[in-house]
């Protein structure tokens, strides 16, 4: 989901820098053979279809909604993820910034909705970001703490164009806190990393984590995963 927000923040920043001031509505659609979130499958390593609608203002403000199918086991209560987000993106002294709030909504039976505050800065081809748990409806287990700031995700991205419109990206992120263990069945502290290439909406990513035999076997979150996808953005 973070990649969707980064794209929207970039659009808001582009509008703010444009000499032609105009608000912008857009829609997006994507399909892939796996839904990966912070190195972990959200679709039991099966295909996912997603889409959303976004608004970006020339003031730097943006907001949007996004949804995808999800599953964590063959018989679990999760079937969809529906996100709502809003933020503000801008640039100062050649450094871009993005601040916002993201709410993750799941099936009512799951009772695991949660929200995060996020922020990032961009310096040249690098982006440094931090997501912080803000609130959740999930119940804490013994010894767990789901309070504000008790789960964090820090990441660094590097992106560049290598010619002929081919985009190359590298990512590394680190999660810390009890919430990931409760939600995804993996240890609270872990690192994920990936490398990706993309062109004209098509993308290919190799991703993995430093986990070792963690979580349900069906999720294989300690294995290297190959993700192929296609995305389409439409101006409304």
PLM regions: where:
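Outer-membrane beta-barrel proteins
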Residues: 2-8, 13-236
């Amino acid at each position: 989901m973070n990649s969707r927000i980064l794209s929207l923040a970039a659009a808001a920043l582009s509008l703010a820098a444009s000499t032609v001031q105009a608000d912008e509505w857009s829609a997006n659609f994507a399909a892939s053979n796996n839904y990966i979130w912070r190195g972990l499958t959200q679709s039991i390593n099966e295909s996912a279809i997603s889409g959303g609608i976004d608004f970006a203002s020339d003031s730097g403000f943006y907001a949007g909604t996004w949804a995808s199918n999800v599953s964590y086991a063959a018989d679990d209560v999760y079937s969809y993820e529906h996100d709502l987000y809003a933020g503000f993106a801008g640039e100062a002294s050649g450094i871009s910034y993005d601040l916002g709030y993201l709410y993750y909504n799941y099936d009512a039976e799951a009772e695991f909705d949660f929200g995060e505050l996020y922020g990032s800065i961009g310096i040249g081809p690098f982006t440094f970001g931090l997501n912080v748990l803000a609130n959740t409806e999930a119940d804490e287990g013994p010894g767990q703490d789901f309070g504000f700031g008790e789960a964090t995700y820090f990441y660094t991205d590097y992106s560049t164009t290598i010619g002929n419109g081919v985009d190359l990206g590298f990512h590394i992120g680190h999660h810390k806190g009890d919430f990931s263990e409760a939600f995804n069945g993996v240890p609270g502290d872990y690192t994920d990393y990936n490398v990706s290439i993309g062109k004209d909406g098509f993308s290919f990513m190799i991703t993995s984590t430093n986990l070792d035999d963690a979580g349900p076997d069906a999720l294989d979150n300690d294995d290297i995963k190959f993700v192929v996808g296609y995305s389409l953005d439409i101006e409304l």
